[in-house]
Structures are given as C-alpha cells and as structure tokens.
C-alpha cells in the first residue's frame, strides 16, 4: 500500500486511474519505457515512473523492475570486436515491423559465479514469437551452434535478419553471414531498448527462471513448458492475438 507520507506529496498528475494502469503494467513485467512508449506517449516520461516508484507513490516496490540499470561509470567487460553492420544500416521495414522473418537475439545467463550454463533467446519482431535454447557457455561457438539449430529447424525464408547486442558471443557474425546468408545488425552499446522485443520476452521467461537460477540445470521439458505458456498469451500489441497464432499466420503467407 502507498504510505501516508507518500500521499502528502503525491503529484497531481498521478490520478488513481493512471496509477492503476502503471501498476498493472509493471506487474505484467513491463518496463517504464515500454509503458510510456506503448500507452502514455506525450503524457509523461519513463523517468517520472521510476521516480514515482522510488518515492513510494505507486503501490509497488522496486523489486517489480526487471532491470535496475547499470551503475554510472561501469565498463563493458564482455569482450570487444569490430562489427560490420550496425542497427543504422538495417532496412526500414525491419524497424517498422512491416515484414515477417526478422529476429532479435540475446543471451540469458545464470547467476554470476554459479554456472556457465545459459540460454540463447530469439524473438521474431513482427509476431513476438519467442524461442530459447540451452547453451553450455556464453561463447561464440556455443551461439553459432544455437543459431545453426534455429536455422535447421526453420526454413531460410523465416530468417531474414538478426539484430543483436555487442556481447562477445555474437563475434560469430561473419560465420553466420557466410554459412547462412543472414545479415546480423549490431545495436548501439548500452541501448537495450533497440532490442525491446527480446528484452521484454526475456523478462517474461525470468518469471519462470529467476536470476538466481542455474540455467544448466533447467530441463528441456521445463523450458519448453515456459515457452509454450509465453507464446500462447494474448498480447495487446498483437490485437490480443497470441505470438503462436501470429507466427503460424506468417508461415502460411510464405508457403
């Protein structure tokens, strides 16, 4: 509940209806950026939502935030390499989600120091269809194996582009482009919002496997069960259709 002291300085803009909307979306694992970008453009900034949470104006705690952000001054330690294609080179149709077959990729890791086991995650941008595969570690070789598995499972028509961050596991991009003919575009550093679909989907998967989980011990059955549930949830951004239904529709249009 909201404290009495918080109510004293409650912003006039924060109506009960607005508070209920924000609290509901936060409980659904949305980030403040996603809430503003989807439903509150021009109403307030996402920084305002963070402020309201920290100051106790909303009936949620900071635990509801999926990502707390990096501390100022921290340096990226995941390995550096030269990229060829950046997100600025990506076709506009990918940005607008106009066409089917464009994917965002990421890696979900186990708790630091606990295990090298991790998951390669893939999201089709137009349908939000979500795939995750177990990897032994966060290396370029393991990521290439995961991408190869996705390529062998789906047809090349369903894999037109990949958008990734600058993690060391994606140093396999030249091998991917050479062997599979799939261009790989790199997001800007510290710009997770440029891969918002994947960030959001990873947050949904974390509901099943919290950050302290040793992902090496997650069984294939449990992973599959979680993916089925996620892909069969109706999404507002899809007109309350499910990612699974939208993905099937996209495949049918290509056949």
Region locations from a protein language model:
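Short conserved beta-strand segments at catalytic cores or DNA/RNA-binding microdomains
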Residues: 108, 114-131
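Mobile genetic element proteins and their domesticated derivatives, centered on retroelements
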Residues: 22, 35, 49, 106, ...
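Two-metal-ion RNase H-like nuclease active-site motif
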Residues: 100-111
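Short, basic alpha-helical/linker "hinge" immediately adjacent to a nucleic-acid-recognition surface
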Residues: 1-25, 38
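Charged alpha-helix within mobile-element recombinases
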Residues: 16-20, 24-28, 177-184, 188-255
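Basic, flexible linker segments flanking DNA-binding modules
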Residues: 1, 44-97
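Acidic/histidine-rich, metal-coordinating catalytic segments
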Residues: 157-170, 190
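Active-site beta-loop-alpha junctions of metal-dependent nucleic acid enzymes
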Residues: 111, 115, 132-156
């Amino acid at each position: 509940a909201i404290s009495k002291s918080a109510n004293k300085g409650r912003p006039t803009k924060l109506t009960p209806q607005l508070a209920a909307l924000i609290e509901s979306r936060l409980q659904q694992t949305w980030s403040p950026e996603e809430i503003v970008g989807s439903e509150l453009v021009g109403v307030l900034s996402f920084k305002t939502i963070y402020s309201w949470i920290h100051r106790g104006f909303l009936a949620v705690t900071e635990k509801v935030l999926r990502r707390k952000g990096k501390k100022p001054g921290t340096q990226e330690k995941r390995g550096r390499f030269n990229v060829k294609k950046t997100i600025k080179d990506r076709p506009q149709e990918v940005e607008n989600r106009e066409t089917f077959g464009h994917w965002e990729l990421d890696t979900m890791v186990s708790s630091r120091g606990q295990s090298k086991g991790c998951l390669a995650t893939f999201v089709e941008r137009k349908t939000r269809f979500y795939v995750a595969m177990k990897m032994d570690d966060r290396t370029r070789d393991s990521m290439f194996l995961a991408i190869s598995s996705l390529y062998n499972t789906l047809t090349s028509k369903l894999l037109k582009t990949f958008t990734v961050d600058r993690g060391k596991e994606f140093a396999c991009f030249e091998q991917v482009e050479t062997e599979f003919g799939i261009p790989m575009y790199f997001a800007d550093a510290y710009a997770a919002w440029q891969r918002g679909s994947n960030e959001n989907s990873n947050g949904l998967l974390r509901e099943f496997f919290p950050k302290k989980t040793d992902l090496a011990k997650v069984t294939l059955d449990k992973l599959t069960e979680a993916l089925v549930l996620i892909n069969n949830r109706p999404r507002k951004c899809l007109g309350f259709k499910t990612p699974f239904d939208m993905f099937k529709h996209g495949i049918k249009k290509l056949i």
